[in-house]
Amino acid sequence: YATLLPAEVGYLHVDTEAVIAIAQDGEQLAKLREMRDGFEFFDKPYDASQVKLQHIIVMNAEGLEPADDWESLADLEARGSEQLEATADERQRRANDQQRDDTATYTYTSGTTGPPKGVVQTSGNMLSMLESAEKCGVINQDMKAGGLFLFLPLAHSFGRLIELSGPYFNTPIVIAGIPT
């Protein structure tokens, strides 16, 4: 969530050992920079060596001073476009190597009774969710043809279902622009 404090962001990064972060804007970039130097969360100190973050991508970099610790989404897209053909075989190999029991994502509890607890969701879990949504009619032909409207945060399991439905069912998704 955009409202998370730097220590909360840091905790999630340490817990998942994430090496790449995508920040919406300068405000979120500042949180990543702050937690990178270490933080305290639920009275437990975390030092910089525990933060594995190596690369930050900023989606809306307008007004930000260039720096070595982040890259704009536009620059990443340009760099990626230049390498599409050269990396096609490697990307296909990686896609083919994916197994249903591979980790796909983490979903966290709210943390109301202590530090948030991460739930590992596998590729198989996500695929089963999509297959079941279609089978029981949660995602039907009309929705596939007309598109889906996503208003839930991507930290929410149903929000993730809608997010993944776009590429899985080859259907458009409209994402609400209201911060959550």
Regions found by a protein language model. Give the residues of each.
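Structural core segment of the AMP-binding/adenylate-forming
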Residues: Y1-R79
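Hydrophobic/aromatic ligand-binding patch that stacks against planar heteroaromatic rings
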Residues: L12, Y108, L164-G166
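Short glycine/serine/threonine/alanine-rich loop segments
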Residues: A18, P115, T171
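Conserved pre-ATP/AMP-binding loop-to-beta segment of ANL
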Residues: A78-Y108, P115, N140-G147
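Active-site beta-alpha turn of Rossmann-fold NAD(P)-dependent dehydrogenases/reductases
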Residues: T107-S110, L152
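Short coil-to-helix segment of the ABC ATPase nucleotide-binding domain corresponding to the Q-loop/switch region
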Residues: T122-S123
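Conserved AMP-binding/adenylation subdomain of ANL enzymes
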Residues: L127-L150, L154-T180
